[in-house]
Amino acid sequence: MESSEVLQEIREVNLAYLLLAQRLVRENQVEAMFRLGVSKEIADILAKLTSAQLVKLAASNMVLCRFRFDDHALLSTLTHTAKSHDMQQIHAAILLARQPVESLN
């Protein structure tokens, strides 16, 4: 895959992520903050971005979303077969809730 293709795919992922994040924040800010792992400050900014601003942000050559499963226990929980899918989801939510939110610091 060529470098220009990779950059285009990164931009597409960025735009899809920003559009989803903004929709989540506008529908239910508290739930969005939990699901996205962002602070109220970032959620407020996401909610107010115009379409032009979203497109400009998405044009970055850096991936804007962060892989949150950097904890071995959490990743193992999500990847191993569990007897109860509901319990697995609850356990994952508890582990994710322990992680600090992203802020503008």
Curated annotation (Swiss-Prot):
Keywords from the UniProt entry = Activator, Bacterial flagellum biogenesis, Cytoplasm, Disulfide bond, DNA-binding, Transcription, Transcription regulation
**Single GO term (MF):** DNA binding
Q: Which Gene3D superfamilies match?
A: Flagellar transcriptional activator FlhD
GO CC, sorted alphabetically, is: cytoplasm
Q: What are the GO BP annotations of this UniProt entry? A: bacterial-type flagellum assembly; positive regulation of DNA-templated transcription; regulation of bacterial-type flagellum assembly
Q: List locations, semicolon-separated.
A: Cytoplasm
Which InterPro entries does the annotation name?
Flagellar_FlhD, FlhD_sf
Q: Which Pfam families match?
A: FlhD (PF05247)
Q: Does the keyword Disulfide bond apply?
A: yes
What role does this protein play?
A: Functions in complex with FlhC as a master transcriptional regulator that regulates transcription of several flagellar and non-flagellar operons by binding to their promoter region. Activates expression of class 2 flagellar genes, including fliA, which is a flagellum-specific sigma factor that turns on the class 3 genes. Also regulates genes whose products function in a variety of physiological pathways.
Q: Which HAMAP family match?
A: FlhD
Q: What is known of its domains?
A: The C-terminal region contains a putative helix-turn-helix (HTH) motif, suggesting that this region may bind DNA.
Question: How the protein assembles, per its UniProt entry?
Answer: Homodimer; disulfide-linked. Forms a heterohexamer composed of two FlhC and four FlhD subunits. Each FlhC binds a FlhD dimer, forming a heterotrimer, and a hexamer assembles by dimerization of two heterotrimers.
* Family to which the UniProt record says this protein belongs: Belongs to the FlhD family.
Q: What is this protein called?
A: Flagellar transcriptional regulator FlhD
Q: What organism, scientifically named, is this protein from?
A: Cupriavidus necator (strain ATCC 17699 / DSM 428 / KCTC 22496 / NCIMB 10442 / H16 / Stanier 337)
